[in-house]
Amino acid sequence: MKEVKIQLPVKDLPKSWYNIIPDLPQPLPPPKEPETGPSRLEFLSKVIVKECLKQEFSDQSWVPIPEELRELYIQAGRPRPLRRAKRLEKLLKTPAHLYWKREDLSPTGSHKVNTALAQLYYAVQEGVEGVVTETGAGQWGTALSYGASLMELPCVVFWVRNVHDWKVDRRTLMKMYGGEVHPSPNQLTEVGRTILKENPDHPGSLGIAISEGLEYAEKHDGYAYSLGSVLNHVLMHQTIIGLETIEQFNIVDEQPDLLIGCFGGGSNFGGFTLPFIGEVLNGKRECEFLASQSLAAPNISQGEYRYDFADHAGKTPLLKMYTLGHDSNMPPIFGDGLRYSGASPILSLLRNLGHIKTRTYPVDEKDVFEATRTFLQTEGFLPAPESSYAIRAMIDEAIECKKTGEEKTIACNVSGHGFLDIFGYKSVLNL
């Protein structure tokens, strides 16, 4: 019988991140300046940690992880296990082999810690006095608050208002880590004041929260802005997930036919899949990749592939990506970490070239959360609402394998736990 839990020894924790940019089939379209206004690239160079900006444009395939940072990863519980979902397989009566990567086991309950610790490590090296960021579902804000507490740095978080207001327990956790948490849009910023003047009850969006974080960093000396998704260096830090997973499949002498991840801006999907995609591009393996999304924000599924801003106010450079429009209005969902207008430029290019498939699910989230309940009752673990989209897609693929008799090996990334999201499940499932 195949192992149910595949644990990589600590000594085998990856020593470098993987940067896919040199292996892409086409050059990645570079960021562009808009036709009017100040230089956005110059602005970013003032508010983002310099080493992170250097990594953003790196042409190195492998970027060494500093030893002190590897120790922080180990302290945070890496390497993380890969599990075989045998009870779920049995319930579905599928010939497919189902696996899930456990990023829910981090101290804050999500994969976001992987880049939070990296960005903060470099911030301290450069003498940064504080960090500021945005957060949607709250996982990124929690991760940065956690990392900042270890580094003894102040951390300011602008949190999408409609989620901030109902996730009281996660807000408390952020504050216990020392985070200074503000609902977004907020009167603290010019961006927020303008939006609230037009609509005092605006629910907020990740694009708005990013704009507020950038403005805060610009106006507060010594502060750096940290972004939790989309950018190249963020995805690179997250490749530790996929690099571990490659070695874990080697341990059980099995290789995945399909990798699945939920998709908002792309950090968890990219971190899980890019090391595998790189091997596909280099002719070393065959595998397919599926991004699972909400119809509330189907950026990489239904967006336009064009240049657009990454934030609501247009403070960032223009990025070539699949976008719904940087100022688009998206309906609130409980999987709010997926509610973002744009997709990572790297993943957008790969999608445009046909290397990534997509699937979308209804805004009401009923089918997605029913999959969560099935997973909880078979595997015993509660995933985050965002991760539930990956689980829903994995179950759907397993059911298709039952119909066709195909013995696929399918793996999904469970990007976080849902212990602080119970209200969302209660509301949708009428519990």
Predicted regions and their residues:
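Active-site nucleophile and cofactor-binding loops and adjacent substrate-binding regions
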Residues: R102-V113, V131-W140, L231-V234, I260-G265, ...
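Claisen-condensing/thiolase-fold acyl-transfer catalytic domains that form or cleave C-C bonds
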Residues: F263-G271, E365-L431
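Active-site-proximal loop->helix
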Residues: V132, W140-P203, N299-F309, D421-N430
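Alpha-helix C-terminal capping segments
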Residues: A118-V128, T142-P154, K175-M176, T273-G283, ...
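Active-site/ligand-binding loops adjacent to catalytic centers
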Residues: I65, P79, I195-H233, V252-D253, ...
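A short, small-residue-rich loop immediately preceding and capping a beta-strand
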Residues: A123-N162, Q255-F269, F289, E386, ...
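Positively charged, low-complexity intrinsically disordered leader regions
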Residues: K2-V128
